[in-house]
Amino acid sequence: MKFHGTTILVVRRNGQTVMGGDGQVTFGSTVLKGNARKVRKLGEGKVLAGFAGSVADAMTLFDRFEAKLREWGGNLTKAAVELAKDWRTDRVLRRLEALLLVADKENIFIISGNGEVIQPDDDAAAIGSGGPYALAAAKALLRNTDLSAREIVEKAMTIAGEICIYTNQNIVIEEV
């Protein structure tokens, strides 16, 4: 799957979890929108979620994920695993093309349609076409500065926007 037009980054530091997403929506080689909102709070404001991929598919997955959060009493780990199971086995859901990045104060997960629920080894994760750039910048800043999680997300997303042509610098940031 190729996900153009998206960079989503999450960083956790000092009890703060911050997620940022760029605002660019690209169709082929054309920028259709520059201020899309790809990051939001779910689960009564305790969970951050961002997406890479088809907007309509992501909205469906956000709805399903929020239902799983309610079903499992806000347990992010259980909700992520159960969504991944449904996504992989449901005939309609498995056609959806997106990746989800979800986080709360304790956990970060990347959820994919082929049943993967990936928990990163450290306190940062990213998805989308600019994800590798944002993640590399965030890891360097985590290891070599005392910046806050929010400052790291802002700087790393700016760097990704300078490198990835499918990422802009209209960044939406949410934190828990």
UniProtKB/Swiss-Prot annotation:
Residues 1-5 form a propeptide. Signal peptide: none annotated. Na(+) binds at residues 161, 164, 167. Its EC number is 3.4.25.2. GO terms for molecular function: metal ion binding; threonine-type endopeptidase activity. GO terms for biological process: proteolysis involved in protein catabolic process. SUPFAM superfamilies: N-terminal nucleophile aminohydrolases (Ntn hydrolases) (SSF56235). The keyword Disulfide bond does not apply. It is found in: Cytoplasm. Keywords: Allosteric enzyme, Cytoplasm, Hydrolase, Metal-binding, Protease, Sodium, Threonine protease. Its main location: cytoplasm. GO terms for cellular component: cytoplasm; HslUV protease complex; proteasome core complex. Protease subunit of a proteasome-like degradation complex believed to be a general protein degrading machinery. A double ring-shaped homohexamer of HslV is capped on each side by a ring-shaped HslU homohexamer. The assembly of the HslU/HslV complex is dependent on binding of ATP. According to PubMed:12646382 the propeptide is autoprocessed in 20% of the cases in the expression system (E.coli). Belongs to the peptidase T1B family. HslV subfamily. This is ATP-dependent protease subunit HslV.
